[in-house]
Amino acid sequence: MKRVFLWLIFVLAFHKLLAEKIGDIASVVGVRDNQLIGYGLVIGLNGTGDKSGSKFTMQSISNMLESVNVKISADDIKSKNVAAVMITASLPPFARQGDKIDIHISSIGDAKSIQGGTLVMTPLNAVDGNIYALAQGAITSGNSNNLLSANIINGATIEREVSYDLFHKNAMVLSLKSPNFKNAIQVQNTLNKVFGNKVAIALDPKTIQITRPERFSMVEFLALVQEIPINYSAKNKIIVDEKSGTIISGVDIMVHPIVVTSQDITLKITKEPLNNSKNTQDLDNNMSLDTAHNTLSSNGKNITIAGVVKALQKIGVSAKGMVSILQALKKSGAISAEMEIL
């Protein structure tokens, strides 16, 4: 025990030098949310509910009234104060009976608005068909511009628990959020240094099996494991939103020298120094831009995505134009980092 905590004190002292805790980069297999769904009615709408042409809504009203001993045909119901909705929620791990969870409500008929209404008691089912929660509550307008969907904080009560016996387990599996051979081995080696050999073994680039030391319960063991810092190797990645023109990337992602043309813009990227002229502008990190010839120079240093984006802004390229140029750089091989298009 003493050896374990001495090691933890050592690694925590250097936490600023280490990128992540194990709990930030890996989840415990089996400890997860479960999705719930239900069909219900929102009542009390001021004429903004489903029209009588929404037959499933009228039939649902008829069924609801019949459950309280009021019998009426769906064809005779003309109300516009009720809307049919779908309710979704996430059941968190280890949720107990009586706990409250948030719910999301969405109209599925032709209602104009469900704001100001009340969701009547609706069972929420999981994929196994069992009822795990009951949802009910008033819908407030909030700040949303969407009148056909809403959230109710603590809008459902847990009625059935998902049983999971963590306490008596001897072994668990960690799953890295992003598969990486190096990170899997780092987790394995770090845990074995802290708790002793053969506590952890990497099964593949995403999965590490861990065995509980006898001196700890599984809850204690996982609590310690999740707090241990680790040298985390993250993939270089560029995220591009084509619709908004938003670009997200690491500042140190490299771009190889190249000439790229997209639409009516041509940009030359080079490491060669530029001749000083009135058209040459100094950018950050010793980079220079010749605005007359659209030439970006790193003056012998590595060129980064951040520098390219700044140069394109100086030239006056639109956000969507930047997206097109980055895509062209990726296709040409000038960017080796992974690119995700949203």
UniProtKB/Swiss-Prot annotation:
Subcellular location: Periplasm; Bacterial flagellum basal body
A GO term for molecular function: structural molecule activity
The entry's keywords: Bacterial flagellum, Periplasm, Signal
Signal listed as a keyword: yes
Keyword Signal: yes
Signal peptide: 1-19
Biological process (GO), any one: bacterial-type flagellum-dependent cell motility
HAMAP family with a match to the protein in the record: FlgI
Protein's recorded name: Flagellar P-ring protein
